[in-house]
Amino acid sequence: MRQEHRSILSVGRSIPSRAASLLPQLDSPPSASARIRKLATLAPHRRDAYLVAKCASGQGELVGNRGLLGHLPSSSMPPQKSPQSPVTCEQRVLISNEHGEKLVGLLHQTSSKKLVILCHGFRATKDDSILVDLVDAFTKEGISAFRFDFSGNGESEGEFQYGSYRKEAADLRSVVLYFSKQKYDIIALVGHSKGGNAVLLYASKYNDVPIIVNISGRFALERGIDGRLGKNFMQRINKDGYIDVKNRKGELEYRVSKASLEDRLSTDTLLSSRAISKDCRVLTIHGAKDEIVPAEDARQFAAHIPNHELRIMAEANHRYTGHEAELTSLVLGFVRRHLYHRSTPRLRPKL
């Protein structure tokens, strides 16, 4: 699969000085392989040398709390805060889904091949602040992370669809297969809002990722529609075949087709929840003051998913405004606990 790379700026990551200080010594050798050989002799830690060399060869960008460290003089390098701070390299990755549409994502590569995949919500993108905060937490833990745009969203190809729950789960399958072929150990899938539905649907169909985190996903998909489409939406869509959703200025935001609405209404969250393997660890986090999806939906997931843990955050809304650190801590703690203390064998795909 072809990969496309571009310069990425990142904030909030700590790069050890032992690795970052190697970049000024690279004197522009004639080839990427020459750079890698030179770095192998310079770096005192083999995995750090590999990551710095990979970034220097054009396969990604070494990032730190001031952005692209390779573009800064050594005197500008941030001080080393901890000898255990991970090196992180970011790559822009293109992955084809089953329809041939290119899904665009960012791989945050640490020295570990353990990987968490993060999924955005309705009308959001891979740059959603919730996902960015989670990526920062995982990479500081030394775990690689990948965030991407579902088809029809953000930079990815395809047409935006109102429903598309099954298609987004299929997009996620394409991503999992891609990284599995690259020999990554995919340890967890994390999704916010509609992305939570995507990771749960994935788990109900495939039994190959051991940890699932559903943040504010919706159980009762028949609810919440009139908030976006207005009253009497069924009569209107049956009459015209579609409904145009406009913003407060009267500008068209997106069109809801009858087929996409039917896709949402026919997605059975009860059946899919019960189909998740008891060997899969599932965490649902929900805000008690969620103004988009009621907390009762989280309790419904808890009632029907076999191996499930529920956390209700008393003061949090749908975006976890003012509670971002607590959300990140819950997600990271759950993944860390089951990653390092799991006793069950690696899950196998359902036949």
Annotate the PLM regions:
Residues A316-L351:
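Catalytic active-site module of serine/aspartate enzymes centered on a nucleophile-bearing elbow/loop
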Residues K102, T110-F150:
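Short, surface-exposed "cap/lid" segments of acyl-processing enzymes
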Residues K126-D127, N153-I186:
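Catalytic nucleophile-loop/oxyanion-hole region of alpha/beta-hydrolase
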Residues L51-S112:
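N-terminal cap/lid segment of alpha/beta-hydrolase-fold proteins
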Residues S174-Q235:
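Primarily recognizes the serine-hydrolase "nucleophile elbow" in alpha/beta-hydrolase
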Residues E253-A275, E296:
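Active-site nucleophile elbow and catalytic-triad environment of alpha/beta-hydrolase enzymes
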Residues I276-H286, D290:
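Short beta-strand/loop motif that positions the catalytic acidic residue
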Residues E291-D297:
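Conserved alpha/beta-hydrolase "acid-adjacent" motif
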